[in-house]
Each structure stands twice: as C-alpha cells, then as structure tokens.
A protein has these predicted regions:
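A eukaryote-biased signal for long
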Residues: 156-291
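N-terminal segment immediately downstream of the Sec signal-peptide cleavage site
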Residues: 18-95, 232-291
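Generic detection of intrinsically disordered/low-complexity segments and helix-coil linkers/edges
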Residues: 3, 16, 41-43, 92, ...
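Gram-negative bacterial Sec-dependent N-terminal signal peptides
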Residues: 1-13
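Predominantly extracellular/secreted and cell-surface proteins with exposed
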Residues: 51-198
Length: 291
C-alpha cells in the first residue's frame, strides 16, 4: 500500500492524561500514531487489506482482472527536532499478491488479453516503505492540527497522495517527451472515537479503505496502450499480527518473503521501494542471469 502516511508522538506524552486532546499538537501526534502504528516505540503493527483490481481503457467496459491480498508490517519511533518539537517516524515493509479473480489462487503467470502473451506476475514486495518524520510543528512553524473528522462516535481520517514524478523505467528525457509516473492513492481511515481518545491504549483498532488509480503495471507488458488500473480494497489492523492474516498471505510470507514477519529497524535509512523500482530489480536480475 504503499504506500506513505501520517505521524504521531511519544508514549510518555500520550499516556500522561486519560484522554487524548485532538485540539492540541501533542494530541494530534498521539492520535495519528495510534492509527498508523503505536504510541510505544518499536511495537510492531500489521495492517491487512483485501480487494479487487479493474482494468480501465477508453471505449470498453471496465474489466475485473485481479483480486488482491495485502499486508504491511510497521513500527514507529519517537524523533525530536529543536525547532519542530517531538514527533515520530514510521518504518514498514509492504506485500501484496495478485490472485485469479475467479479461483482466488495466487497468479504466477498471466495471459495478456490484448496480446495473448503469457507474462510472469511480479507481486508487490516493497521493502522499505518508510515515512518522513512528523512533528508537533509543521515545516512552516505552524502547530500541527489533527486532520480527521469526529462524527457520531467515529473518527474519520482521509489522506490523498497525488503521485507525479520521474518514472524509474521511463528513460532520461521525460522532461521533454513525457512518460512521468502519474497515479493517485487514497487512504481513508476510520476508528471508534472512544478507542482513539483512550490514552491508556497504545494502539487503535483502525479500519482502512484504499483506492489506487495507476498506469498498467510494467509486468503486464501493455506497452503504450491507453488505459490503466483501478484498485479498491478495505482492511484493518490485525489484533494477532502476522498470525491473523489470511492463510494465503501467511503461506506466501513463509515461503518467499520471510523478512516480512517483522518491520525494518527504526533507524532504516534505505530509499523507499515502489512497484516500479522492484520490477526493475526483478527484471534486471532475470536478464543478467539469462546472459
């Protein structure tokens, strides 16, 4: 899921009162941190999501091409800044597998309906997916405000990530001929108000709705054909961590992605991985092995 997101605070400040005050920067940090991870440094949290992927192209109906099962294992650590105060940084790994929309079995290969070419499926294995620190004061010095909405006992927290940047597969002349990576990810979190504001609890039982609008995945080999993909999924934090994930994900982690049982270290300084950079690594490794 990519994915990127939010911020929070340290355990001593979050637990110093019985109720988190969303109107204060410290309260905003604590609430965001409870939704995203935990107010306890180094406590692993697992998000799971399940959904569908549709192909969308001009002039033809949308087509259900994949189901998906995904997870993200994360932890947060407290950070401080002399000008911006106390905050936190989130580190994570993210795995999402593509499933046959009829059988719900893991896809290892896929037949491109436009070309009838059988291609290897490259699942999402982004390690790491880390966030920038968030502090009690923003970059311009303003006090941090909680961006969620409280209504009828629920807290709703929307987050949109418009993505437009140089495509790692697009060559050296994108500023002249185009081909930038252009996508949108939308994360909508929801949590019970009493759960979120309870300062004695380090984590919230949060739910998430995730939408992604993106170009064709590079492993699909769609070339320059017009169109793209729409992802739609819902999920939540897992009370039992990795053990609470669906069997298909647990089996895939055990067999092919053993590092995904734990998050990266809190001091992880690696650049973030994306579906496009991961595909490049897989493709380049296979091409080198074939030579």
């Amino acid at each position: 899921m990519a994915s990127a997101v939010l911020a929070a605070m340290a355990m001593p400040m979050a637990a110093s009162a019985q109720t988190i005050d969303l109107s204060t920067p410290a309260g905003a940090i604590a609430a965001n941190r409870k939704i995203q991870c935990s107010t306890v440094d180094g406590e692993p949290v697992v998000y799971h999501w399940s959904g569908r992927v549709y192909a969308r192209a001009p002039g033809v109906p949308d087509r259900h091409v994949f189901n998906v099962e995904g997870m993200n294992v994360r932890q947060c650590g407290t950070v401080t800044d002399s000008a911006r105060g106390t905050g936190y940084r989130l580190v994570s790994r993210e795995l999402m597998i593509y499933l046959d929309p009829r059988t719900n079995e893991i896809l290892r290969t896929w037949t491109n309906p436009e070309t009838d070419q059988v291609v290897e499926v490259v699942h999402v294995a982004n390690d790491p997916v880390n966030s920038r620190p968030t502090f009690e004061r923003t970059a311009d010095g303003s006090p941090l405000r909680f961006s969620g909405r409280v209504n009828q006992g629920w807290v709703f927290l929307p987050f949109e990530a418009p993505l437009f940047y140089l495509n790692p597969l697009g060559g050296d002349y994108q500023e002249y001929v185009g081909n930038h990576y252009h996508a949108m990810e939308i994360f909508d979190f929801s949590v019970r108000e009493d759960d979120l504001l309870d300062a004695s609890r380090s984590r919230a039982d949060a739910s998430i709705a995730w939408v992604r609008i993106s170009p064709w995945l590079p492993w699909m080999r769609m070339g320059g054909r017009p169109g793209g993909l729409v992802f739609n999924a819902i999920g939540q934090t897992m009370a039992n961590g990795i053990d609470g994930l669906p069997q298909v994900l647990r089996d895939e982690i055990a067999t092919n992605y053993p590092d995904y049982v734990t998050p990266p270290p809190l001091n992880d300084a690696r650049p973030n991985e994306t579906s496009w950079t991961y595909f490049r690594k897989v493709f380049d490794a296979e091409r080198a092995a074939a030579q």
